[in-house]
Amino acid sequence: MAFQIPRGTQDVLPGDSEKWQYVEHIARSLCSRYGYQEIRTPIFEHTELFLRGVGDTTDIVQKEMYTFEDKGGRALTLRPEGTAPVVRAFVEHKLYGSPNQPLKLYYSGPMFRYERPEAGRFRQFVQFGVEALGSSDPAIDAEVMALAMHIYEALGLKRIRLVINSLGDLDSRRAHREALVRHFSNRIHELCPDCQTRLHTNPLRILDCKKDRDHELMATAPSILDYLNDESRAYFEKVKQYLTALGIPFVIDARLVRGLDYYNHTTFEIMSEAEGFGAAATLCGGGRYNGLVQEIGGPETPGIGFALSIERLLAALDAEGVELPVESGLDCYVVAVGERAKDEAVRLVYALRRSGLRVDQDYLGRKLKAQLKAADRLGASFVAIIGDEELERQEAAVKHMASGEQTNVPLGELAHFLHERIGKEE
């Protein structure tokens, strides 16, 4: 029986994995530059965490979670998103007592959602995200959005736009909720079955519906921006002011509500405008969640963050034709001709690697010509050939693969020679 990977998953093979490493390196480096530290949480949590943290009326909780019972009868769930686990760790380890407030964290790892697989979307996907906990300053909202944009721009994406909205505080959302119920109630039969249920549980979710997004009722639905109280309106104005001061262009979409229940005040998405990327062009989403820490059992603590899918980021790079400057190939391939030379090659390869070079050798007992072909396939910049004659002179015949230029180099000087030549090439 030939086994295949489960639907909605993928293997990342050599040649592609280097792109993943590069993208993750850029994201991590920028987070460090902005003062964010890494946090790592388990890939499964108690199911109740997501019921409370994500919201039991959300599509994620109702339709998409991978939930199971362990041998101890505990209900556990493979994490569908990263914010609730980070907040759980924040509360459990009493990080709210840290003098370094706000606490700025980033994470990266696999998430799991049972949804229909499509281009750039998987049932297991890698999410990179940040969370800033402990500040309700609108300047940190702008910082989080600036960091997200910086990651995409540093990777070479140009056809992206930042879309923002405000959901306001609790009073603003309550007034907007009542207006939505009045708006949709008389024509509820025109909505999809899910939205008919949402009208009574969480009417704001109707605005996030993919099935009814083009319905005339959506276009005429009450705007949350018309229901912001003075405090919420002033907060949103300050966020926009900071973004403008940073020179970050944005557009406002009053229907941007995001798919999780914990958001309030600022919400945002980064969209791809690349041709052929598809209708679902959201690359990144985030927002403020001032009540989530309390909901999970901690003290009242404001927070804001974002999450992006590495898979969708790579798809956007492909759509824009961006070539990542990933390292590939070897610095040197050591070719051994004869058993005595093989013994020396093993020692030499180890020494060259210890000096910081990318080096490999033959392990299949191939002839000289076959080893040279292998070096070429592996993208080696140089080949160091050792045979009986070279051993007698304690030298290697070093060939530059691109030019064909060949020179004899003492074995004790080979590492220095390669570092010098490769440094000049770079």
From Swiss-Prot:
SUPFAM superfamilies: Class II aaRS ABD-related (SSF52954), Class II aaRS and biotin synthetases (SSF55681). GO terms for cellular component: cytoplasm. GO terms for biological process: histidyl-tRNA aminoacylation. It is found in: Cytoplasm. It catalyses: tRNA(His) + L-histidine + ATP = L-histidyl-tRNA(His) + AMP + diphosphate + H(+). Keywords: Aminoacyl-tRNA synthetase, ATP-binding, Cytoplasm, Ligase, Nucleotide-binding, Protein biosynthesis. Its main location: cytoplasm. It is an enzyme of class 6 (ligase). Its EC number is 6.1.1.21. Belongs to the class-II aminoacyl-tRNA synthetase family. PANTHER family: HISTIDINE--TRNA LIGASE, MITOCHONDRIAL-RELATED, HISTIDYL-TRNA SYNTHETASE. This is Histidine--tRNA ligase.
